[in-house]
A protein has these predicted regions:
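N-terminal hydrophobic or amphipathic helices and topogenic motifs
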Residues: 16-25, 46-52, 79, 143, ...
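N-terminal segment of the mature folded domain
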Residues: 1-49
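Short loop->beta-strand "edge-of-pocket" segments that line small-molecule binding or catalytic clefts
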Residues: 52-74
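Short beta-strand-to-loop elements that line the ligand-binding cleft
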Residues: 84-98
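Short coil/turn segments
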Residues: 36, 40-46, 62-70, 142-145
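Periplasmic-binding protein-like
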Residues: 33-35, 126-155, 174-181
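A ligand-binding cleft/hinge motif common to bilobed small-molecule-binding domains
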Residues: 4-19, 102-132
Length: 183
């Protein structure tokens, strides 16, 4: 951060944001919510239904890089379920996008990955096993809210045109779009 960024998009839960920027009063503008889940091959041939299936010896994971929404969720869930990452084949191999993890599965190099539903909607070779709904925020310092530029961003996020643009992509929930919360 180092006061070089005025706003950042964060696909994580609101309570996970303040520890990343300790001591800085923050505001988070809800952009949309999206479904995060498992990518599996068409027909789900290995019957993968949840995180515990990642420990099976016949399942290879295409993992995302540290700091990505998918990886943050996976690491939190593994800790919660007391599952060692060492028990997951493919955990150490990192990919930098949902598109690259999905290609790994389509090319039959792996069996599953965690990512957002939007990627699966662009191919007929994958299926999606939903795990949870994740918010996407625009995060900024509270002091910035009075700046004309930030007010313009808020106005855009609250506009019907913005909501319709998100709806047209068929994978984003705009129920809370435009809501501002203080962290």
């Amino acid at each position: 951060y180092f006061h070089k960024v005025h706003a950042a998009v964060a696909g994580i839960f609101a309570e996970d944001i303040p520890p990343l920027l300790p001591g800085i009063p923050l505001a988070a503008l809800m952009l949309y919510e999206f479904s995060l889940g498992l990518y599996v091959a068409k027909g789900n041939p290995k019957n993968i239904s949840g995180i515990r299936d990642l420990t099976r010896s016949d399942v290879i994971l295409a993992n995302r890089e540290k700091g990505s929404t998918s990886r943050i969720y996976l690491d939190k869930k593994l800790k919660e379920l007391q599952i060692s990452s060492a028990s997951i084949s493919g955990y150490q191999k990192e990919f930098v996008s949902d598109v690259s993890t999905s290609a790994f599965i389509i090319n039959k190099n792996g069996d599953t990955a965690i990512g957002e539903k939007a990627v699966v909607l662009k191919t007929n070779r994958l299926e999606f096993v939903p795990l949870l709904t994740v918010p996407m925020y625009l995060v900024m310092e509270t002091a910035s809210l009075d700046s004309p530029g930030f007010q313009a961003l808020i106005d855009i996020a609250r506009s019907e045109e913005f909501r319709m643009s998100l709806h047209s992509q068929n994978c984003y929930d705009t129920t809370y779009t435009g809501e501002l919360i203080y962290l």
